[in-house]
Each structure stands twice: as C-alpha cells, then as structure tokens.
C-alpha cells in the first residue's frame, strides 16, 4: 500500500527508470551522539561507500559487512536491494564528496567531503563543481529516461538538512527525523544554531556554509533532468527540494518525494509540514516489516533507521509494479539471512 500526500500520484511511476544513489560524508557525523548510521562515529565515514557497494554487489568491499547501527540494526540498503531486485533498473552511484570512496564504478562530481557546519561545510569552488557537474549528469540521463529515482547515503544528513532548510528561510527547527528512535533534538539544535551564526546573505554561500555535498548533488541532478523525479528519502529530501526551488521555482511540479511510513508517522519529527512548506508532493510506502523473521528487521517498526539509500522510494517502485508486502519482506529476510550466515551480524 502507498499513501499519497499533497496531490502525489503513483501513476507517474509506471515507466522504466534509473536509480541514482548520491553518496557523501559530513564531519558532523563525527560528533558523538548525533547519528547511529554506523557502529561508531568514525565508522560513519565508511557507511556511504559500503551502502553503494551492497546495493550494486550484494556485498561490501570497504568494510567487512554491511553498515549497522551500534545495536546491530542493518542499513536500509538491504531494503533497497531487495525492492530493486524485482525491477532491476539501471543503478548509478554518484560520489558528491565521500571521505571513503566505494570500490565499484561511480561517477565523481569533483566535490569534497563536507566539513563541520559549525565552521564551514564546503568551499565555493567545490559547491560550484557539485552543482554544475550534477546538472550535466541530469541532462545526460534525460536522453534515455523519462523518470529517475534519486536516493542518498550520508550519515548525519538530517542535521545538515535542518541547517539547510533554516538557512533558506523555512520553519524546520526540530522537525527533521533521525535514524535513532530517540531523536537527539537538543544536540542537533545546538549544532545547527551554532552553524547558522553569521550567515552570508547570498543563498549559494549559505549552502556552502551549512549544507552537505549530497544535498547539492541531489538538487543539481534534479535541476538538469527533464522528466519526472522521485526523490527517494525522508526529511533530507525536503531540504534537497528546497535547494531545487531556490534555483528553479517551476521544477517542483515534476518532483515527488518517495519515503517510508516510519518517516511520515515519526512523532519526533514533522516531515509532512516541511514538504508542505517547500511545496513538494509526497508518497509513502506502508511496508510492514513486523512479519519479518529477524529482530534486526522488525526493529524498523520500532522507529530504528526509518529511511535511507532510497529504501522508501524503492519499496514504492516495487509495490507499484505489483510486488506484495509479504513477497518483499520474504526477499528482505532472504538477503539478511545470507548476511547473517556469513558474518557476525546480530539477528
């Protein structure tokens, strides 16, 4: 089942599409307690590369196993790979600025890893590189596709998303989600408030100060693409949509955010109000993982992880193509079972 918000319609998704995964890192993820998108703060810099490797290969090369939270909850890349296995679209990994680059073929936007937003996230040179090169990528994809789905992987990305939305004038404080069921709102607020001090007046310079390479790469690819776009992600994609709207006020009519029920139902965030402020449509997958055989998968129903790597959008695409909830969960369990059998993953 798929829920539609703000005029979103699933019929636009009945097309062949390409899956674009934009990866990057921000040093904000090194702040203790801010994100659980990795077993330790230091390992969060390996998460995007490992996510990309797993989606494409079914195994990771940059680390020994798939990224997990400190309590062993698996990366949403597992859900993405399971969903896309029923469709088999073209998959492209785009490096917007990852500290660890994946050991697979990828497109490089000539960006840089994001630094601590409390000081300066990105240089203007790299901001321009990311935007210009991703626009060109979107233009090239337009030659082959009428629809693309863009996912993201960047630990601490909800914090940089909140800073980005606030810097662009939206009411976003405390409204973004977290990979943890215990959203570290006070810490996020403290980091973001410090980042927003002495902001420059120019919007692009504001983004260089407080944003991250992935948001810019997602926005640029969308700006260059001529067809319909499914931004596969949660509150981070509302920030990407806000950047898109800053550059082109007419573009959002072609854009829908595709996410999970765990994002739209998150009591500690308000993704739908952010989407409404920005003016972007939303679809949410009602995928139910409570029937999974594995505790690590069922944990998603308790508010862990929630979204990432295009998990919600990928589930939506599978459901649109007629894959049932039970069939999709069985596939997720099958893939997770293979990983558990070959590693020391928690179950």
From Swiss-Prot:
One of its GO terms (molecular function) is nicotinate-nucleotide-dimethylbenzimidazole phosphoribosyltransferase activity. The lineage of its organism: Archaea, Thermoproteota, Thermoprotei, Sulfolobales, Sulfolobaceae. HAMAP family: UPF0284. Belongs to the UPF0284 family. This is UPF0284 protein M1627_0030. Disulfide bonds: none annotated.
């Amino acid at each position: 089942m798929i829920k539609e918000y703000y005029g979103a319609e699933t019929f636009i998704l009945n097309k062949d599409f390409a899956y674009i995964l934009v990866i990057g890192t921000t040093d904000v993820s090194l702040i203790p307690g801010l994100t659980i998108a990795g077993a330790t703060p230091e390992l969060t810099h390996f998460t995007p590369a490992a996510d990309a490797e797993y989606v494409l290969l079914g195994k990771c090369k940059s680390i020994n196993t798939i990224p997990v939270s400190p309590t062993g909850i698996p990366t949403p890349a597992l859900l993405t790979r399971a969903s896309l296995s029923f469709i088999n679209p073209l998959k492209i990994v785009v490096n917007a600025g990852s500290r660890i680059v994946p050991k697979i073929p990828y497109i490089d936007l000539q960006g840089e890893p994001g630094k601590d937003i409390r000081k300066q996230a990105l240089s203007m040179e790299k901001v321009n590189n990311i935007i210009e090169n991703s626009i060109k990528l979107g233009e090239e994809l337009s030659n082959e596709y009428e629809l693309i789905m863009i996912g993201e992987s960047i630990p601490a990305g909800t914090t940089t998303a909140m800073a980005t939305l606030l810097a662009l004038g939206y009411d976003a404080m405390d409204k973004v989600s977290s990979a943890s069921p215990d959203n570290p709102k006070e810490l996020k607020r403290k980091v973001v408030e410090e980042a927003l001090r002495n902001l420059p007046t120019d919007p692009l310079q504001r983004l260089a100060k407080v944003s991250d390479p992935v948001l810019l790469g997602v926005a640029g690819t969308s700006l260059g693409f001529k067809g319909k776009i499914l931004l596969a992600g949660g509150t981070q994609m509302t920030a990407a949509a806000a950047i898109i709207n800053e550059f082109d006020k007419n573009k959002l009519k072609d854009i829908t955010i595709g996410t999970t029920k765990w994002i739209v139902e998150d009591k500690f965030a308000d993704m739908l109000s952010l989407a409404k402020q920005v003016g972007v449509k939303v679809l949410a997958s009602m995928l139910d993982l409570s029937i999974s055989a594995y505790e690590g998968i069922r944990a998603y129903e308790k508010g862990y992880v929630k979204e990432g790597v295009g998990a919600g959008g990928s589930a939506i695409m599978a459901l649109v193509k007629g894959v049932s909830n039970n069939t999709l969960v069985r596939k997720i369990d099958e893939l997770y079972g293979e990983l558990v059998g070959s590693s020391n993953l928690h179950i």
